[in-house]
Structure formats: C-alpha cells, structure tokens
Amino acid sequence: MSVIKMTDLDLAGKRVFIRADLNVPVKDGKVTSDARIRATIPTLKLALEKGAKVMVTSHLGRPTEGEFKPEDSLQPVVDYLKNAGFNVRLEQDYLNGVDVKDGEIVVLENVRVNKGEKKNDPELGKKYAALCDVFVMDAFGTAHRAQASTYGVAEFAPIACAGPLLAAELDALGKALKEPARPMVAIVGGSKVSTKLEVLNSLSKIADQIIVGGGIANTFIAAAGHNVGKSLYEADLIPVAKELAANTDIPVPVDVRVGLEFSETATATEKAVNEVKDDESIFDIGDKSAEQLAEIIKNAKTVLWNGPVGVFEFPHFRKGTEIISHAIANSDAFSIAGGGDTLAAIDLFGIADKISYISTGGGAFLEFVEGKVLPAVEILEKRAKN
C-alpha cells in the first residue's frame, strides 16, 4: 500500500486539513460514546507537535445537504475537545477561507451539510483543497465512499496523505489478509449469509478455516442436513453454503442452545445439533462446539473476527460468543476485529487490550475484506505517484 504518510511529512507552518471520523452518538448536546474522538486525538496532537495550522472536519449523522440544523452540528465534539484541554473553535462558514492561528484547532462544521458533498462535486472538492497545503485522510470508516471530503479534496490538494489511524488500519488489514501467518482463521457471524456472501467467498480463498456464527451458521447447519426449526436461516442459500463447505474447512456446530421465542427471558436449552425440534430456534452454539472452536483459535497464527456466534445481547445465549471472545483474547495470534456487533462484544467482555487491532470502520472493513478497492485509499495511492 504505497501512500504518503502524515508521519513522514514536515508540517511546520503548513495549513493541514484533516478528514477524521467524528461521527459520534450525541444526546442532549453531549457525546455519549467518545471512542472515535479518542481515536482521533493522537492525530490532532501530532499535527500540533509538527507545528501545523490544524483544521479538522467530519460528517455527523445524516443531515440534508444545504440545510443546516442545530442537531447536525459538530459543537458537541468541540465541547469534548475543549474539556480535553485543546484550544479549539468551531467554524461554520469556511468554504471561502479560514484563518487558523498557531496552536489552535479549527473544527470545520459537518461536511454533509455542504451541497455536493455526497456526490463528490469537484467544485466542492476544490474549495476544500484551497483551504490547505496538506490534506490528511484519517477516516477509515468512510474510505469506501467517494465524497468531496474523502476523495475530491485528495484529488486537488497540493499534497494528499494518510493519517496515522488510516495508515495503521491499512497495515493491520494487509497483515491479516495479504500474507497472513498461518493457520489463518476467520470468524464470520451475523444474521444472514446474503449480507456476508462476498466476505465468505473472499475469505474462502485466504483462510485455512472459517468459523460461522449466528443466523449464518443456521444456514450451514441446514445445509448439513439438520433441522433448524424456526431458526433464522436462508433456505435459498443452502446450495451456496454447501459449495462453500465443500471447498473450505467450515466446522458446523455439534451442539446448540435453543429457545422457543426471541426474548431476553426465553429459557435456553442445550442440545445436540441433530435434535432441534420444529418449534425451537437456535440462538447460540453449545459448550462442546464453543470448546472445539476455541481450540481451533488457540492454534491459529492469524485471526480475523467479524460478528458474534450467538445472540450475545441476551445473557442466556451469550456463552458461545464469550468463550470465542476469550479464546481470541488469550491467543498468541495476530488478531483483527471489526464491525459494530463485534466491538460491542469486545466491550462487554472487557478484552479490548487483548485484540491486536480493532478496526474503526464497519462498511469499509467489510469491503476491504471482500477485496474491493476503497476509493479514498485509491486516490491517495494515485497522488503518491504524482
């Protein structure tokens, strides 16, 4: 991945425009989950240490272009950064130029309010580019979208580079997918095979084993000839599951936890995979399966984790995901995890410091795993050549 890196540049006195991912949940004007801001702070500090004149922007929520509403504002992010000790201010009217003082951070208001942002209007890209000497793309979570603040600005800025977060993300994904230490094990959970089909196809060419979980596993259980009762599964994708299972080592659970209804209070019953009744639904893998899969993970040298193996939000159906999570945490393998539910499981079981790399991007993470080109990375590669 040959891109210019912000860490390698002399930024003294330069106007630096950082596209970060500060799309955080906000309630009553306060940030309710600060993970993305915390992840961006080292980039801001580095830019200040290098003597840059720092501008940073992001999208927040899904505003209507050209119609600014107070709830679309990045003001809560500015308040958070102020409380963290930064000299920071919000600039709403910035497209025709911004004055940035030494040592201050200017947060440029929500880019998605600007007309032409989403469809990557070149005129808007040029306006962003005119604000800076160096454009820094540091929002991996939006790298799969070609928009004016992720792609257009990179086309027209004097220099376009990858920020520390984006560079680390690309390095970690490259390490897991391009030349993984073997055995390489992928864990793919989620409700539907259809939404992860390209991920499964791509990983089947890379991974030594694929562990499937959630509704995806139910389709593979059905493909192996077992009754799945009322479980969520995709009957039309059984041929696809059979083909994947024939060409890749995909262990099917030997036992499962079932319930009669999808609720937190449902009674969990553990049983062999071939004993599921017509009125039962599979909500988790059983202990034997979890231990077998934990053993596979223990012997792995690379683990890519995307999705839980059961309905871990319900305590009765949490054990499978808990055992798998701790197996990954205790493994010596290089581990990379991504996706919203996966991050929630990591938080729940308190294992964040034991995962080698936690990806910040949901859709971008999956598209990279699928082998797709991420537009915002592609333009950085092009600009690095010229």
Curated annotation (Swiss-Prot):
It holds the Pfam family PGK. Pathway: Carbohydrate degradation; glycolysis; pyruvate from D-glyceraldehyde 3-phosphate: step 2/5. It catalyses: (2R)-3-phosphoglycerate + ATP = (2R)-3-phospho-glyceroyl phosphate + ADP. It comes from the Bacteria. One of its GO terms (biological process) is gluconeogenesis. Its main location: cytoplasm. It is found in: Cytoplasm. SUPFAM superfamilies: Phosphoglycerate kinase. PROSITE patterns: PGLYCERATE_KINASE. Disulfide bonds: none annotated. Its EC number is 2.7.2.3. It is an enzyme of class 2 (transferase). One of its GO terms (cellular component) is cytosol. Keywords: ATP-binding, Cytoplasm, Glycolysis, Kinase, Nucleotide-binding, Transferase. Transmembrane segments: none annotated. One of its GO terms (molecular function) is phosphoglycerate kinase activity. Substrate binds at D21, L22, N23, R36, H59, L60, G61, R62, R112, R145. Gene3D superfamilies: Phosphoglycerate kinase, N-terminal domain. ATP binds at K196, E313, G339, G340, D341, T342. PANTHER family: PHOSPHOGLYCERATE KINASE (PTHR11406), PHOSPHOGLYCERATE KINASE 1, CHLOROPLASTIC-RELATED (PTHR11406:SF23). Monomer. HAMAP family: Phosphoglyc_kinase. Belongs to the phosphoglycerate kinase family. This is Phosphoglycerate kinase. It comes from Haemophilus influenzae (strain PittGG). The gene is pgk.
